[in-house]
From Swiss-Prot:
Pfam families: Smr
Organism, scientific name: Shewanella baltica (strain OS185)
The keyword rRNA-binding is annotated on this UniProt entry: yes
Family: Belongs to the SmrB family.
SMART domains: SMR
Protein name: Ribosome rescue factor SmrB
Domain Smr: 93-168
Enzyme class of the recorded protein, top EC level: hydrolase
Subunit composition and interactions: Associates with collided ribosomes, but not with correctly translating polysomes.
GO molecular function, one term: RNA endonuclease activity
Keywords, ordered alphabetically: Endonuclease, Hydrolase, Nuclease, RNA-binding, rRNA-binding
PROSITE patterns attached to this UniProt entry: SMR
Gene name, Swiss-Prot/TrEMBL: smrB
Chain's role: Acts as a ribosome collision sensor. Detects stalled/collided disomes (pairs of ribosomes where the leading ribosome is stalled and a second ribosome has collided with it) and endonucleolytically cleaves mRNA at the 5' boundary of the stalled ribosome. Stalled/collided disomes form a new interface (primarily via the 30S subunits) that binds SmrB. Cleaved mRNA becomes available for tmRNA ligation, leading to ribosomal subunit dissociation and rescue of stalled ribosomes.
Gene Ontology biological-process entries: rescue of stalled ribosome
Length: 176
């Protein structure tokens, strides 16, 4: 086949369908598609992340020594247990390579997953150095109502590059 045959065939086809009107569809009325379950869950996660985690809030966190925080009313022994590694994290979140907005969503999803799975402790790896996530993650965790405490992770769970987080899972008996 060459281009002349194609042009000829196209001209013949155009001559055949000249004057034909498309049939209008008047029998079926289409509804707009409903949102999928995944879209709804994503919107809920974004709403939770935005409502819990403010970038402007500056809590009083230690400048020197290991990063740590304990919610008011929680026994200080819990912080010591986190530091020693008595709590084994059930879930691990690695935030390497995430943008700030993505990290917020992942953090909110991790906390929801901990509550859903009745996981008392989780580990969040934010990375070494003085990057933005290393600074922001503790500030976001302080703002979440389900977080009871966090401490810099022991060496086997990431050391300076990670935090062990203690989650309030409700009135269920604690696991270790």
């Amino acid at each position: 086949m060459n281009k002349d045959d194609d042009k000829e065939g196209l001209a013949m086809f155009s001559a055949l369908i000249d004057g034909i009107k498309p049939i209008t569809q008047n029998k079926r009325h289409f509804r707009t598609p409903l949102k999928t379950k995944q879209e709804i869950e994503l919107k809920e996660q974004q709403l939770h992340a935005n409502s819990y985690f403010s970038d402007t809030y500056q809590p009083l966190l230690p400048v020197q020594g290991p990063m740590r925080w304990l919610e008011e009313g929680v026994d200080s022994l819990e912080l010591k247990r986190l530091r020693r590694g008595d709590y084994q994290p059930d879930l691990l979140l690695d935030l390497h390579g995430y943008r700030q907005s993505e990290a917020k969503l992942e953090l909110a999803a991790l906390i929801q997953a901990c509550v859903k799975q009745q996981s008392l402790c989780c580990c969040i790896m934010h990375g070494y150095g003085s990057g933005i996530l290393k600074q922001q993650v503790p500030m976001w965790l302080v703002q979440h109502p389900m977080v009871k405490a966090f401490h810099q992770a022991p060496k086997e769970w990431g050391g300076d590059a990670a935090l062990l987080v203690l989650i309030d899972i409700g009135e269920q008996p604690h696991r270790r």
